[in-house]
Amino acid sequence: RTIALALAQNGWDVVVHYARSAAEAQATVADIIALGQGAIALQCDLNDEAAVKTLLDRAAAQLGPISCVVNNASLFDYDSATDFSTATLDAHMHTNLVAPILLAQALHRATPEGAQAVVVNLLDQKLFNLNPDFLSYTLSKAALQSATTMLAQALAPKVRVVGVAPGITLVSGDQSEAEFQRAHKVTPLGRSSTPDDIAHAVRFVIEAQAMTGTTLLVDGGQHLIPLQRDVMFVTS
């Protein structure tokens, strides 16, 4: 929501994708329209390959040509090496890797010769500071980071592909607000990322026409502090 509103404030018309949160998506659309920009909400199950492949065409049919895709949707379920299953990995890979690749492919196909579009993939600071928690999620995001580089190579010059890697930003799982606040401060800067920080970074990489195939860390330096567990488990 924060990213969508920030882009609207910067003059973008916005397609708000949702899987199940229709009311929240429509509320975001209403707020964007109130800012004077065009907006629609489109439902799509990111595990449905056929639906993902048509999502950009559906968006363009209602709002006009698409020149930017922000892959922010993410599956974030807990597992570890001791309870790993192929079903859990497959679910994470479909949402966190396959869907972003298909959307980048569709954007490249829709971008005319001589024009340039951009894909922004939301990653995670833990790729630069590994721990054993959230195994399937981490593997899927690590694959997306590699895909960010490979897509940037393959889809240039029509499409730039850039990663943004935030730190802990919102309450995760069964964290209490107090636990989140403690975890949020475990950085060299004394704070991790906020939704506004991430939105600002996304706006920056969209406008930075010389950036592609790289990842911008926006985490207050969280990746510089090694932890044995995921930062969401920090309680003291």
PLM segments and residue spans:
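Canonical Rossmann dinucleotide-binding motif of NAD(H)/NADP(H)-dependent dehydrogenases/reductases
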Residues: 1-15
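Conserved Rossmann-fold SDR core element
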Residues: 7, 145, 155-169, 211-218
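The beta1-alpha1 cofactor-binding region of Rossmann-like NAD(H)/NADP(H)-dependent oxidoreductases
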Residues: 22, 43-55, 86, 196-197
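Catalytic loop of short-chain dehydrogenase/reductase
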Residues: 75, 112, 116-156, 168-169, ...
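Substrate-binding pocket helix/loop in short-chain dehydrogenase/reductase
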Residues: 80-81, 85-93, 183
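A conserved structural motif in NAD(P)-dependent oxidoreductases
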Residues: 187-198
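C-terminal substrate-recognition "lid" of short-chain dehydrogenase/reductases
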Residues: 196-218, 223-224
